[in-house]
Amino acid sequence: MALEKLTPAAGSTHATKRIGRGQGSGNGKTAGKGNKGQRARKGYNEKRGFEGGQQPLQRRLPKVGFASKFEKPYVINVEKIAAIKELAEISIATIASVHKISKSVTKIKLIGASAKALASKIKDENVSVSGTK
């Protein structure tokens, strides 16, 4: 068997539809475009989403929502997890050792009444405390 001897399976290929090549072809004269009108003219190209003058679906539906491109920090209440107060230095790695957090967390915010006292222990720029600048 040689590659040049291969043929497509029976019925898998179809002849190209030749438009505007005489009445005998079944697609002559108006070439399947009907009689007159904008769509019958040469160069006509319908805009994406055009619905024949009816208000397009994209304009009928209301605008919805907003998505911020800034990532929200993972919030931890220091009052609920006492082990964070006892850490010598605070970073994402040390917090992960005492509190279960996802690997996808890249920013942490500590909240609570005693959170401000921990500000001096923070050694990671991705960990912040509420109420401090």
Curated annotation (Swiss-Prot):
Biased composition (Gly residues): 21-35
The name this protein goes by in its record: Large ribosomal subunit protein uL15
Similarity-based family: Belongs to the universal ribosomal protein uL15 family.
GO cellular component terms attached to this protein's record: cytosolic large ribosomal subunit
Function text: Binds to the 23S rRNA.
GO biological process assignments: translation
Record carries keyword Ribonucleoprotein: yes
Keywords: Ribonucleoprotein, Ribosomal protein, RNA-binding, rRNA-binding
InterPro entries per record: Ribosomal_uL15, Ribosomal_uL15/eL18_sf, Ribosomal_uL15_bac-type
Subunit structure: Part of the 50S ribosomal subunit.
Chain residue ranges for the region called Disordered: 1-57
Gene Ontology molecular function: any one: rRNA binding
Species in which this protein is naturally found: Campylobacter concisus (strain 13826)
